[in-house]
């Protein structure tokens, strides 16, 4: 959902309203509706960098966990077919950690498919690496979001070994929140959410945490309520659609701008007709932009596409989008 800095040869999105958003906000030459379509496989060109986040629901602990028996779980095979046919210089794939932990045989199968892209002599054409990365210590955002990242570099193009980004210390959640009137004793409209909120507050007090004066993010809409101090649980699409988490010392849910910051994005200024609920859903379904930026910095350098590592953290000493958001929030509080 972040800014396009250079033209993208193509993108894939089947949601009609998100397609309109992409056209309004991003420089994309061709926008395909489905990766499964004949048009995609016939027309999608080779690129220097291919990035895909294939559907996570089949592998997520929040879903039914059907794996590749879920039709959405078969999208990975279309991705591999594209890689085989077009041989992009580099690729990055992302999915939930449940792919590794709950479906290890499927994960090993996916890795085997990627390593199994071979030349005429039967030699692997890609160097393939993978790692579980948490957005809080890699993306410099106060969100616990563990995802598996798989990267590949075409061996004939590779100039340097690929290295994963270094770990960093994230800011506290309070630094990313907008200045709004605080009503700590407020409760959600839903009686079920209220009961879960009260249970979370009781747990917090037992742990020596004061919900009225400390920033606690409560996931009071989930089947199993969870909470974190000055940080948040994982922001999912469903949670994003319901304005994220309940903030205890504020007495209310998060704003759309705050959800964007939680994913390392600048707040969206041109929604292109999307409602707040639709934006929140899309943000929760997206990559953490700052993790993506840091991994891509290493990947592009390894693939010989840049002559040095342009890592936002190493270059600026801090994550730029979140830093800008904090400066904006501080100015607003001072006014």
Language model: regions and residue ranges:
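Glycine-rich, N-terminal phosphate-binding loop of Rossmann-like dinucleotide-binding domains
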Residues: 54
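Conserved beta-strand scaffold positions in the cores of enzyme catalytic domains, especially
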Residues: 9-11, 30-31, 50, 128-132
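C-terminal target-recognition/interaction regions appended to catalytic cores
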Residues: 195-335
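Class I S-adenosyl-L-methionine
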Residues: 40-49, 57-241, 250-252
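SAM cofactor-binding core of SAM-dependent methyltransferases
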Residues: 1-36
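Alpha-helical recognition domains of nuclear gene-regulatory proteins
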Residues: 25, 82, 113, 295-298
């Amino acid at each position: 959902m972040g800014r396009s800095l250079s033209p993208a040869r193509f993108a894939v999105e089947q949601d009609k309203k998100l397609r309109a958003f992409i056209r309004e906000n991003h420089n994309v030459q061709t926008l395909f509706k489905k990766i499964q379509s004949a048009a995609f496989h016939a027309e999608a060109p080779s690129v220097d960098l291919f990035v895909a986040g294939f559907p996570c629901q089949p592998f997520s602990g929040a879903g039914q966990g059907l794996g590749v028996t879920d039709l959405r779980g078969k999208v990975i095979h279309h991705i591999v077919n594209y890689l085989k046919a077009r041989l992009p210089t580099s690729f990055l794939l992302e999915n939930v950690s449940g792919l590794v932990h709950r479906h290890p045989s499927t994960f090993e199968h996916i890795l085997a498919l990627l390593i199994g892209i071979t030349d005429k002599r039967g030699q692997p054409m890609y160097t393939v690496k993978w790692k579980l990365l948490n957005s809080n210590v890699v993306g410099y955002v106060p969100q616990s979001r563990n995802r598996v990242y798989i990267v590949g570099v075409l061996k004939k193009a590779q100039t340097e070994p690929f290295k994963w980004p270094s770990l960093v210390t994230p800011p506290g959640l309070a630094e990313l929140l907008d200045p709004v009137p605080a009503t700590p004793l407020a409760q959600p409209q839903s009686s079920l959410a209220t009961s879960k909120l009260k249970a979370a507050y009781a747990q917090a007090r037992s742990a020596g945490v004061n919900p009225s004066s400390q920033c606690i993010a409560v996931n009071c809409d989930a089947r199993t309520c969870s909470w974190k101090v000055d940080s948040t649980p994982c922001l999912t699409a469903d949670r994003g659609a319901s304005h994220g988490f309940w903030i205890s010392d504020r007495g209310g849910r998060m704003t759309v701008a705050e959800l964007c910051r939680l994913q390392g994005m600048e707040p969206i200024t041109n929604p292109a007709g999307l409602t707040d609920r639709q934006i929140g859903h899309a943000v929760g379904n997206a990559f953490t932009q700052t993790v993506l930026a840091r991994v891509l910095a290493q990947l592009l350098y390894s693939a010989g596409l840049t002559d040095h590592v342009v890592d936002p953290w190493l270059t600026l000493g801090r994550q730029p989008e979140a830093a800008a958001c904090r400066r904006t929030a501080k100015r607003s509080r001072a006014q």
